[in-house]
Amino acid sequence: MVARPADGSPALRIYVASNKKIKPPLEIGDCFLGRVKRVGGNLWAKPFARTSKAGGETEAEKIFGVVERRGNEYYLRPSQKNARLDYLLDDIGKCRDGDFVAAMLIGERKFKQARIFKNYGPFDLNKAVSCLVLDKYGIGCDFPETIGKETARCPKFSKKGRADLTSVPLVTIDGDDSKDFDDAVYAERTASGFNLIVAIADVAFYVRPGSALDREAYRRGNSVYLPNMVVPMLPEKLSNDLCSLKPKVERAAIACFMKIDRSGNLKSYEFKRAVIKSAARLTYREVQDAFDGRFNAQTSGLFTTVIQPLYEAYFALDKARKKRGALELDVPEVKIKIGKDGLIQSVSKAEHFASHSLVEEFMINANVAAARVLAAQNLPVMYRVHEKPLKEKLEEIEPLLRGLHLKLPEQPALKPAHFNRLLEVCAGKGWSAGIGNLILRLQAQARYSPEHLGHFGLGLADYAHFTSPIRRYPDLLIHRALIKAYNMPDGGGLEDNADRSLFEQIGEHISATERQAVCAERETDARFLSAYMQPALGSDFDVKISGLTSAGIFAAVESLGAEGLIPMRTLPDDDYQLRNCGFELFGTRSGRTFMFGDVIRARLTEASPVTGGLIFKYVDEHDGVDYFEKGSRGSFRIVPPGAAPEPEMGKASGRRKAKLKSGKSKK
């Protein structure tokens, strides 16, 4: 039997060794997990487990976890948060107690065991967490040997036919730790408004369609950013060097020239290949400091000619954004800083300055310009699509809106501004954060598609991603289309015979890799946060209620961006029911109410870096009673309709009692 790679990469002849433990035996068309090694002049694969049968039926489940010895037997403690069972290991081989491993589930449904196929060694936060998420989502770190050879042969760009922008003081504005600089900006005042330039690294010059670099970039789809490492879409020689818009170094770029009026409206635009020389590598913080009057040696000489015009143009663009009613949701990010020793140095909520919004608005308008140019040319385009919320989702929140005396219009007339109005009405109330969270959950997931459907959240009819080709494959596709649209020199454009029918498949693939990256980043953050919180076991925290379910209360430690669960069993003894679209957990006997956004006191009882889980127990501050130790248990039941009237949100009822008892009030 001969095997080929499942990801569709160039076929290799791999001979398959037999494994009598896999029953029924492997057949043609089956997919399996195995270890490949060279024997003589041939490649042989030793199968460990079948992953799917011919036709796509899933045969085995891949899991990760820690090996635990219990007496004479070894078990796998899964790393998944929702795992309810540990699995008996049929053979640990050379693994030891405490090793972090990957395994396949085998055996009957009711008596599943786990078989180890990869050992990462003793559990180590940096190594284990990274390996787990990367392997789980099929994200590869190392580039094939062919990529290194092709990168070494990358040609030097020619200045011929390119706009010379080396004398224009374009600057890059990025985070403190950024290493790949793919965008630079410039603004100058005019009689009617502003001239803007957004220069983006000319990745298409180096990554040609159909090349090994192109195939690998497509397979990855995007870069993945973990606290302790970056898995780049492109090799470091390109991402951090040849394509990176380093200061004082000539670099190839594709520049978007835009004219806006004083109200921030985009009046005209054009794209050209260019040569630029970044005047400075600035950070968001130092740009904001300069605008606020705190200069350093670098920004003092750039303020009048560069930084001040950028802000003036941004204020105009912000007017246009507000006028069109882009969705204004505050989604906080957590920043986890890892030291050179691999230990967590600090955890904090990421700061957001006006300088972040400045860069964002420049990029958004360049993206709009790219989408409009390509739509007019009728070229194959990979749009960034964000559709309106589904009608069914909107119907689910109607009872909540009635309680707030609000109403959203029917879907065809629905605009982001209607959600902004809802946020304004709820601002300052304890549950305002809950409304923001609810609005976020209502939104459709943004994706890549050749369909020209617009971007609901930004309030834009035309939108595509053009500004980050170093880390996003769809942006590279837009660059190639622009090169073709303008017949730019130096090649690398969309091929004449580009198959439009493939664009839907490409869009699905890069949307999937984006979702995988988000999941990998989220899971990694959770595990690092759990490790960071471990020394605080037994400590009490003021936590904000960020979710309510039949399982209990989700509680956020806002200063750290960490979230854990307060299980229902740790709540005061009562019968609880969810009300107002899950915004209230109401105790039917006591009248006690827990509401989304309330701040309560909770004690950290578990912090597991293996799963990324945090478990708290509820503590009543008012009377000093720890209900977990007291032995009281809360229970959840679904109350039949009509059994008890639901109070409107904001009415005193049990909510006021809960605040008095906990000693907390948002007002």
Language-model segments: which ranges?
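Charge-lined substrate channels and their catalytic hotspots, especially those that engage the 3′ end
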Residues: 1-200, 204-250, 281, 286-289, ...
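A short beta-strand motif that forms part of the nucleic acid-binding face
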Residues: 5-9, 18, 78-82, 107, ...
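Structured C-terminal cores of nucleic-acid metabolism proteins
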Residues: 9-12, 26, 369, 392, ...
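A residue-level signal for conserved active-site and pocket-lining positions in enzyme catalytic cores
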Residues: 29, 98, 116, 173, ...
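Feature marking long nucleic-acid-engaging regions of large polymerase/nuclease enzymes
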Residues: 87-88, 109, 174, 181-393, ...
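A short, charged
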Residues: 107-110, 114-115, 149-153, 293-315, ...
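Short coil/turn segments at secondary-structure boundaries
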Residues: 131, 145-149, 163-166, 268-272, ...
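Phosphate-interacting basic helix/loop segments used at nucleotide- and nucleic-acid interfaces
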Residues: 165-172, 176-190, 310-327, 523-542, ...
